[in-house]
Amino acid sequence: MKLTVTLPTHSYDLTIETGALDKIGTWVRSLWQPQRVAIITDETVNKLYGAAVEKELQAAGFETSLIAVAAGEQSKSLEIAQLLYDFLAEQQLTRSDGLIALGGGVVGDLAGFVASTYMRGIHFLQVPTTLLAQVDSSIGGKTAVNTKKAKNLVGTFAQPDGVLIDPNTLKTLEPRRVREGIAEIVKSAAIADVELWHRLSSLENEQDLVAHAEEIITACCKIKRDVVEEDELDLGLRLILNFGHTIGHALENTAGYGVIAHGEGVSLGMIQITQVAEQQGLSPLGTTQELVTMLEKFHLPVTTDRWSEERLYQAITHDKKTRGGQIKIIVLEKIGQAKIVSLPTEEIRAFLNREGGI
């Protein structure tokens, strides 16, 4: 399956095909002429796919170099970005060369950020190997690194030249990482596609979903593609993709990156915001329970111990959706349809101080 993301200044294809990674050299050759290519990956993915990917690229005529960062959210930092700049300079990469992000969401965000800022921008490709990256973060051009203050605080919008998605990589993904991606799939269905919601309802468990991965990934990519085409720079409609993310990011930040995985934070965030939206008449009664039923089926968290209200408040009010003392909150009008509401930041405290906590 091939989907095209059509934007005013730059369009590119999403290739979704089981076994596509085995033909990565041919795919890259169809987009770029032989040149230097740097691969940024993490240590886990490198052990699984690094050598094979380099071999395929070299067979297609590319001169390759590879660097593997530590796996995990801690690598998504300005310090690691600096190391990558130095690596690219040592490899003498120029603006006529290219970079490939091979890995999950952390690698994609980090490598995209580095590509968009090294020499004021070089060409790059996304090759996501986790379910979360395949259905969400590899598409749309958002790149970022974290700081101690907030997740994704420093970043750019930079579109890749292409995205290659091979569902076979899910076979080597640990169950927790599969569930992370499922949280984003549930989010996508909840905000924009009731038919996908019904399809997810028909699946028995995570294994059943992975067995139908190409179909499910394609449906999510269509949602992301359609939203990004209408709002590339996150000024309006694209904000709906952040359903569950404001509180989710805050939970990740206050717990310490990696303690709560991104998908787990999104799962908790979707439940919390929908509980409040129901109380305020913004979402129909029963919407939270529909989410709980779906998320629990895939063994995603729906409750957690109360975190420090003040730390959560500070993290949320540093969220990039906060402007002029107002924060944009995404709520469900119904399953399959989301809307954006603006709230004064001080009202966020009411969200965090509900009886029973998050």
Curated annotation (Swiss-Prot):
Catalyzes the conversion of 3-deoxy-D-arabino-heptulosonate 7-phosphate (DAHP) to dehydroquinate (DHQ). Binds 1 divalent metal cation per subunit. Can use either Co(2+) or Zn(2+). Disulfide bonds: none annotated. One of its GO terms (cellular component) is cytoplasm. One of its GO terms (biological process) is amino acid biosynthetic process. Belongs to the sugar phosphate cyclases superfamily. Dehydroquinate synthase family. Zn(2+) binds at E184, H245, H262. Its cofactor is NAD(+); Co(2+); Zn(2+). NAD(+) binds at G105, V106, V107, G108, D109, T129, T130, K142, K151, T169, L170, K171, T172. It is found in: Cytoplasm. GO terms for molecular function: 3-dehydroquinate synthase activity; metal ion binding; nucleotide binding. Its EC number is 4.2.3.4. Pathway: Metabolic intermediate biosynthesis; chorismate biosynthesis; chorismate from D-erythrose 4-phosphate and phosphoenolpyruvate: step 2/7. Keywords: Amino-acid biosynthesis, Aromatic amino acid biosynthesis, Cobalt, Cytoplasm, Lyase, Metal-binding, NAD, Nucleotide-binding, Zinc. This is 3-dehydroquinate synthase. It comes from the Bacteria. It catalyses: 7-phospho-2-dehydro-3-deoxy-D-arabino-heptonate = 3-dehydroquinate + phosphate. HAMAP family: DHQ_synthase (MF_00110). The keyword Cytoplasm applies. It comes from Enterococcus faecalis (strain ATCC 700802 / V583).
